[in-house]
Amino acid sequence: MEELDLRQIRRQINDVNDEMLKLFVRRMELSAKVASYKKAHNMPTLDRKREEDILQRVANCTEDEYRQYALEFFRYMMDISKQYQETIK
């Protein structure tokens, strides 16, 4: 791989990172709305069934090569979301 090619690939990765950051912020904003709803209705932060459904969908939609990493990514993202939801008053 030539250095120029590496720079181009890294620029593309930076672009993807920028898109992912925007989506992350949007997801956290929605998580805050979920937290407010759950608090107003005396519901727990954790919804195991919802998490299982999300992970099953991720597993079904991800190629074998990336599946374990996608699942790990989504588990971590859901953990962060739960932590954040706990801070919502």
Say what each PLM segment does.
Residues 1-89:
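Domain-level signature for soluble enzymes in the chorismate/prephenate branch of the shikimate pathway
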